Amino acid sequence: MAPPRAPYIVPALKKHTATVIMAHGLGDRMSLAQNWRRRGMFDEVAFIFPNAPMIPITVNFGMTMPGWHDLTKLGRELDYESAIRHQDEPGVLRSRDYFNTLIKEQIDKGIKPSRIVLGGFSQGAAISVFTGITCKEKLGGVFGLSSYLVLSDKLKNYIPENWPNKKTPFFLAHGLEDEIVLFDFGDLSAKKMKEIGLEDVTFKSYPNLGHSADPVEIEDLARFLQKVIPPEDDGQASAGL
């Protein structure tokens, strides 16, 4: 398998004090930064959009496409129990390790872990949530749009002993009409996250929303980011990443 292409980066406009790593879903790209920038938001935040490697996806008849892990089922076939039975554990762990590498790169650049937020959409959200739960660094926050919990039956095996992110804010959002990752799967995943001991999990639902994002959901996400990585710029210009 070829390594993923380098991430797409939107540098901070002011002094770089925080980073948001946003991962796409199966085969797509996710970019909200430009819209927020046009509104004068998150000027001191660098946005990193990682690219998934090209892998065969079983549910797409083995076709090679960008993916964070293999999937054997989608839609009404992808429920909590079937997800446990058909998990691509090596793929999940490979992507988690890559996300942790991106986090470490930001820390090495001087960004505090508490000013790093990890999240994404669909598959990217699932890996972001798993990475956030199991990360050895205390992150600022984690979000997942149309997300689901991977390796839930083995999750405790991967949680660090001191569990740095037990109290980290997690924001989960899901459309009630999602036809790819069903709402019930997302809802149950959020409940499972609370059951294992996460103390700050917010789960919001959106009527008439399928497997996509809408303006209300994006506004809720923006408010979450404003809360967990508030501005602390001193007015200096950014040197970029």
Curated annotation (Swiss-Prot):
Q: Name one GO biological process term.
A: fatty acid metabolic process
Enzyme Commission identifier(s): 3.1.2.-, 3.1.2.22
Please list the reactions this protein catalyses.
Answer: S-hexadecanoyl-L-cysteinyl-[protein] + H2O = L-cysteinyl-[protein] + hexadecanoate + H(+)
MF terms in GO: carboxylic ester hydrolase activity; palmitoyl-(protein) hydrolase activity
Main localization (coarse): cytoplasm
Which EC class is this protein assigned?
A: hydrolase
Q: Report what the protein is called.
A: Acyl-protein thioesterase 1
